[in-house]
Amino acid sequence: MYIGIRTRQEVEVQALTMASHVASLRGWHTALARAEIASLLPMAVVKRLPARRLIQLEGEISPEHMLEAVNCSSGCQALLSHAVLWSTEQPIDSLLKQMSDYIQTHTRTGSVAVRSWKHEGKMEGVSARDLMRKIGGMLSSHGYKIDLEQPEHRLGMVLDAKAGIVACGWMIGTGDDSDGISARRATDRPFFKPVSLDPRLARLAVNLASGPLQKGVTLDLMTGTGGFILEAAVSGREAYGIDLDSEMIEGAQKNLDWAAPVTTASLLLGDATRLLDVLPSDIIHRISGFVLDPPYGRNSQGTLEPTALIRAVLESCYSVAATDAHFVLIVPIHPFGEHAEEALPEDATVELLHGQWSELEACFEQTGWRLLERWVEHVHASLGRLILHAVIVPRD
């Protein structure tokens, strides 16, 4: 049994009114992106909008927290502060009136520009260029200096053609579909193995497990080539990576030096099933995020079969975890098809490549962890990945 996160990710369609904030998501796996931003901004209530790549964030969120979240996020391309939401069912003049009021209410100091981008193709009957020109004119009439090259502030506008929604607000983030993470793809690293994770998924898993940057330590349990710890280090997290194979530790260190030459991240030679014997004493019970992508083709734990290995790791993690720790596990599965818009329902049946789902589920329940959500990533015609998110359950 696992528990879906319903308190922060409500699935009902929200009325299109003045939102607290709107997050614009990249399109590669929107279900995971929603969960990631909820983890990075735990003070926010995340609500669904009719557009698959737009979500509403309610609550008191500081600009500093929003900037930190979008800068380290894998799945969020921008946040629009105190955004205006408009539907094509309304007259276009109502959007312009709302934006006029918005510009007067939400002031900025310094030069500005208007930036627009599209989701799901071209929006019929709405010209992004015309809207940008009119909103830019409003800014100019209120005394703002327009600087298209290096503005100090950007007013973002995203047009979602499929949902018929326009969201506008002062931007935090770039609005780009490209996140820059692909520059660290596995094949470009000094040390490479074919089984290495896509850095987008590695970054997202780290954020999902660890939460806000200052929450605690991130632990990459079987680091291999260092995919998780690289993304944690580049984000500025306090992070440790462990592996029993000295070749992997040496190779991961080369990758770490290449990706993040100035970092506090550290690699340790040791056994993830015996963490109390491996970790520095000052991080015990400060570890808030555990990430694990077990090396099935290279069983570094001797004769343990996959499910027994995961159980032993979960037990070891429980003994060193913070009281609010989270755990993200990625395991290979038989093809499940595309399923990028929603978390898996509780009754969905998945076939693991190694072991049985019922046994893996029991591993979490019996070692002090509660499964929250699970997602599937399509890899190719003969392989998928199951991403599991769990939270620690304090023992009596």
Set out the residue ranges of the language-model regions.
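Class I S-adenosyl-L-methionine-dependent methyltransferase catalytic core
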Residues: 2-74, 78, 119-126, 130, ...
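A broadly used, surface-exposed interaction patch
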Residues: 65-103
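N-terminal cationic-hydrophobic initiation segments that often serve targeting/anchoring roles
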Residues: 103-104, 318
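Phosphate-coordination loops involved in phosphoryl transfer and adenosine-cofactor binding
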Residues: 108-111, 215
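Basic, glycine-rich polyanion-binding accessory segments appended to enzymes
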Residues: 114-117
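Short acidic low-complexity segments
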Residues: 145-151
